[in-house]
Amino acid sequence: MSQGKVVQIIGAVVDIEFPQDAVPRVYDALRVTEGDLSGLTLEVQQQLGGGVVRGIALGTTDGLKRGLTVENTGNPIMVPVGTKTLGRIMDVLGNPIDEAGPIGEEERMSIHREAPSYEDQSSSVELLETGIKVIDLVCPFAKGGKVGLFGGAGVGKTVNMMELIRNIAIEHSGFSVFAGVGERTREGNDFYHEMNDSNVLDKVSLVYGQMNEPPGNRLRVALTGLTMAEKFRDEGRDVLFFVDNIYRYTLAGTEVSALLGRMPSAVGYQPTLAEEMGVLQERITSTKTGSITSIQAVYVPADDLTDPSPATTFAHLDATVVLSRDIASLGIYPAVDPLDSTSRQLDPLVIGQEHYDVARGVQTVLQRYKELKDIIAILGMDELSEEDKQVVSRARKIQRFLSQPFFVAEVFTGAPGKYVSLKDTISGFKGILDGEYDHLPEQAFYMVGSIEEALEKAKKA
């Protein structure tokens, strides 16, 4: 392959001069072949003219010197795919980082691929039961849909994601791919051990580009994970693709954009924000052979949902699960806001009339309680009408019944995790709305699985 020389280094951005007749294409992978950083991979981002290309380094550039030889591999970044990647931790280039020997893959695929054509895409609507009451009730997931977990720092995005992986691996025995994009290394480590302890590690491929890595790694690691998920889908499987955190993907794009000298747009984000997000999201889709159901954690800067990054993400999603700091402060976990969370599947034609009526009934009661809170704060409960007192009582029971002990949080809570089927979830909330459990104390509904457990808890109290 053609060889070039390093001519300029600015942080993670490196300019390399090639012969005029052998200039690498955009997105080609280049490899440094000499010096201390021999083996460092660069990805071409721009062709500057005069045989010079500008690349972004997928690794540290400390110790890189001008004049070093760089060779063009002639291909984009190629990563291992297939069942050999299950149970392994890899970096953005598909190299193992779990000290368990080579991957031994039978095939590698380019991380840059076209999205499936319109004819190939499937349009079937099938619900994916998660076993988490609040999600199954008010913002049900579709098989092959895209879900966003929105929340500020520390409200439980990663824990919710771990619970979803565990439930789907155990209850539905499906494969998952997890892309850790710009998150804490400690979380990546915890995640690995949690999956190991839950005996689901052999059903998950893990790809990490953590906070301490250069922006090129964080920008591309989501595509690495997606390529692995696409391979499973093309083999006819239903696969789950988890991204934690899609905001860091945007942020890495902002860093790369600034390093490449592009003009920033609103709030300092890259001018290509919508296009970069579209390139990733359009590939996450279901075809007639298999499905990719994607669950993406979305960090919301300063809890502001109108920030360009979360706002751009919203446009691509089928369901949004909004985690609320106010609900977390009440000690109700998962801290999902049932009034803010939505799903395109919440339609009687998709989920059936009974489910729809119960979900809307729950939201109506909670909304009325929210409106009455101001009156209660000023005048107290005694000033309410009997009807409103009943609404408040049921709303508080519903609020507590929306909480649930998680399997992955057993270590912290000391309570065994619960998986609640959709049927039990609907019948439980229907009973509360119909007044069947008005005689029970509200504390009986806190941190239980099905309604039967609430009845047991009330008897013991």
From Swiss-Prot:
General function of this protein: Produces ATP from ADP in the presence of a proton gradient across the membrane. The catalytic sites are hosted primarily by the beta subunits.
Entry keywords, A to Z: ATP synthesis, ATP-binding, Cell inner membrane, Cell membrane, CF(1), Hydrogen ion transport, Ion transport, Membrane, Nucleotide-binding, Translocase, Transport
Protein name: ATP synthase subunit beta
Disulfide bonds: none
Homology family: Belongs to the ATPase alpha/beta chains family.
SUPFAM superfamilies: C-terminal domain of alpha and beta subunits of F1 ATP synthase, N-terminal domain of alpha and beta subunits of F1 ATP synthase, P-loop containing nucleoside triphosphate hydrolases
Main location as per UniProt: membrane
Residues reported to bind ATP: G151, G152, A153, G154, V155, G156, K157, T158
Assembly notes: F-type ATPases have 2 components, CF(1) - the catalytic core - and CF(0) - the membrane proton channel. CF(1) has five subunits: alpha(3), beta(3), gamma(1), delta(1), epsilon(1). CF(0) has three main subunits: a(1), b(2) and c(9-12). The alpha and beta chains form an alternating ring which encloses part of the gamma chain. CF(1) is attached to CF(0) by a central stalk formed by the gamma and epsilon chains, while a peripheral stalk is formed by the delta and b chains.
Presence of keyword 4Fe-4S: no
Record's catalysed reaction(s): ATP + H2O + 4 H(+)(in) = ADP + phosphate + 5 H(+)(out)
GO MF term set: ATP binding; ATP hydrolysis activity; proton-transporting ATP synthase activity, rotational mechanism
Cellular compartment(s): Cell inner membrane
PROSITE patterns the UniProt entry points to: ATPASE_ALPHA_BETA
Pfam family, one: ATP-synt_ab_N
GO cellular component: plasma membrane; proton-transporting ATP synthase complex
Membrane topology type: Peripheral membrane protein
